[in-house]
Amino acid sequence: MRLSEAWLRQYVNPMVDTAGLVRQLTMAGLEVDGAEPAAADFSGVVVARILEAAPHPEADRLQICRVDTGGGEPLQIVCGAANARAGLVAPLAMEGAVLPGPLKIKRSRLRGVESFGMLCSAKELGLEDDASGLLELPADAPVGADIRDYLQLDDRILEIDLTPNRADCLSVEGIAREVALINRLPFRGVDAGTVAVGSQRRLVVHLDAPEACPRYLGRVITGIDARAQTPRWMKERLRRSGLRSLGPAVDVTNYVLLELGQPLHAFDLERLSGDVHVRQARDGELLRLLNGEEITLSSDVLVIADEEKALALAGIMGGEQSAVGGATSDVFLECAFFAPALIMGKARRYGLATDSSHRFERGVDPSLQRRAIERATALLLEIAGGEAGPVTEAVREDLLPLRAPVRLREQRIGQLLGLNLPRDEVADILARLGMSVEEDEPGWTVTPPSFRFDIALEADLIEEIGRVYGYDAIPRRRPAVASAMQPASETVLGLDRVKDLLADRGYQEVITYSFVSAEMQRRIDPEAEPEALLNPISADLAVMRISLWTGLLDCAQKNLSRQQDRVRIFETGLKFVRRDGSLEQRNTLAGLVLGSILDEQWGEKSRRVDFFDVKSDVEAILGLTGKSSVRFRPAIHHALHPGQSAEILIGDGGAGWLGMLHPQIERELGFEQPVFMFELDAGALLQRDLPRFAPLSRFPLVRRDLALVVARDLPAADLLEAVAASGGPLVRDTVLFDVYSGAGVEAGKKSVALGVTLQDAEETLTDDRVDEVMSRIVARLAADFGAKLRE
């Protein structure tokens, strides 16, 4: 919300500067985002009156003006503005003045005629975008006065970021009420008075939807001057609040909205037919709004209508057919209370965001309407003349919201604030907040004022007491805690270390919902029975996840839909598995990879990621555990490709899964490239085996390569385990460096090349000893797997 500091200080003027005022509001919970100057920096501009305006002899569009500046001889000014005329009061930039830009005004000669200054438009002063003519000032403006002083331009615009619960502060009066409260100053709201009725013309109002609109006030105002102009002081206040002037009728309604927080609307009376109805729209009914957009209404939308048509989207925006214009002389002024629950969301449905809907959605004081319509009437009559008819009020008192009393306990204040306030100070704060207070022994019964929609609980009252007392005034009490250093076990692998490793390998951490859709859960494991939520947020978040893959797949889909086709993500969190009738929470690490193995670059050609790329990432994670008993065993998982999936084992226990997403699920979810996933039990992962020291051998390594023909479906891991077991302590490492099937290898077989590295810690290995070990290895592989040396 934007408002003028000078306007605010007309209601309440504390003895603090702008910085102090900003701090007061922020500490009271009304965060001020900034305080900017109300006008651009300029100097040397005064209020001047044009005494004479004669055509320039050498230019059709120029006039030679004699201008009174309030002292000395009138100045000769050459001006090209279309509205320059004798008697007009306008800003004059004197010789030597500096305008925004910066532009320094000098004596000049225009088409042979000297000009001793420049008459200014609003745009040239940086006040408005209108450059069509001179800025017209009231005829009684003091000639010779500095324009900055006259228009109060040495002002600041406060930008206040209000939380949704503080609808009572969506007005200058509301902010002024808070400033008075903070500074213990007296405060009186705007005294609207009662406008004298000069006409008996009125319209009958029917509340056809009283639950949505329990109070509606209307007034006919006739005979307003269609040529009247909004006064400069009102235009300036509107401008500083971010609104532009649209004519007296609209400007007055906008002004009262800013001043009191009550939206109003003015209809062109001549465009209305018969009585006014506040009703639900008819399905398919059309309404062209003030912004020119035609919308199709539905029956859950509230409209203001006459006997023939919908006139306005209630509480949101008026219609084009009944809008006031430049020729309007009779208006029907509307001021109503609309129930927040029935207005909420309707503006967003039609892509609208208006000042009215912003206030009605959050709640408008249901007792404000009479004062607001009297204030608007008085301002409109003052500016444009006319006669006001009687106020027509349609109301259902039983449907108006009432503020329920709230019990406040003295003991509870101390518990929540950590501060024991005297009872009389608590009562004083509540009274200053405008609340009705009845005191009893354990505390108070407090009734909030009608404008405080956000006060419903005891905690709400205590929050108000805390912020008015001052959060910064509450004494600090640091707890006396004795800290003791505790040894950290080296056998525990920290989860942060695992996250760092994955980040180093190009993964990004994500956090997804623990609740997922039942349909997605069935895809991952159709046999599992996920725990259903009794009151889910939505149908897509109806069950508790049995795997972190559900959230990762959803995240990958969202990334792909935003043209992010290389995804490497991981998540740590709980999954919920039902076992033996009870629900278990298991801490889990899961990851998902798709797209190219490398980011696009010139130095190396990239390729699609494959199973073994992701397997190497999992091996790197498991390598942090120091466990030597890690194995990958081909196995079937409902969510994984039957030919590219493996169960991860540590010892004889299952520790997780790795594989490519099942092709059927891939198609159902719309993935157009392979998706690889892994999931690890964090409990098994985070127990680490400490490394044991062994002296380094100073004798040379010996490597022998084996090319073996084995069954095509034999896992290479089985061969590696057999080599390690049969080779004995001399075998230091075995590496798989080639797999081949095709010409030269019989059908159903494959050729596997192994590099076996041997070393003795005591002496240099001889060929005989190496041959003996290799023969033993080959014999074991032949016996266990039918392996043959490839010729």
Curated annotation (Swiss-Prot):
Transmembrane segments: none annotated. It is found in: Cytoplasm. Residues 39-148 form the tRNA-binding domain. Its main location: cytoplasm. It catalyses: tRNA(Phe) + L-phenylalanine + ATP = L-phenylalanyl-tRNA(Phe) + AMP + diphosphate + H(+). Residues 697-790 form the FDX-ACB domain. Keywords: Aminoacyl-tRNA synthetase, ATP-binding, Cytoplasm, Ligase, Magnesium, Metal-binding, Nucleotide-binding, Protein biosynthesis, RNA-binding, tRNA-binding. Gene3D superfamilies: 3.30.56.10, Bira Bifunctional Protein, Domain 2, Ferrodoxin-fold anticodon-binding domain, Nucleic acid-binding proteins, Phenylalanyl-trna Synthetase, Chain B, domain 3. Its EC number is 6.1.1.20. SUPFAM superfamilies: Anticodon-binding domain of PheRS, Class II aaRS and biotin synthetases, Nucleic acid-binding proteins, PheT/TilS domain, Putative DNA-binding domain. Mg(2+) binds at D454, D460, E463, E464. GO terms for cellular component: phenylalanine-tRNA ligase complex. One of its GO terms (molecular function) is ATP binding. InterPro entries: aa-tRNA-synth_II/BPL/LPL, B3/B4_tRNA-bd, DNA-bd_dom_put_sf, Fdx_antiC-bd, Fdx_antiC-bd_sf, NA-bd_OB-fold, Phe-tRNA-ligase_IIc_bsu, Phe-tRNA-ligase_IIc_bsu_bact. It comes from the Bacteria. NCBIfam families: pheT_bact (TIGR00472), YtpR (NF045760). This is Phenylalanine--tRNA ligase beta subunit. It comes from Methylococcus capsulatus (strain ATCC 33009 / NCIMB 11132 / Bath).
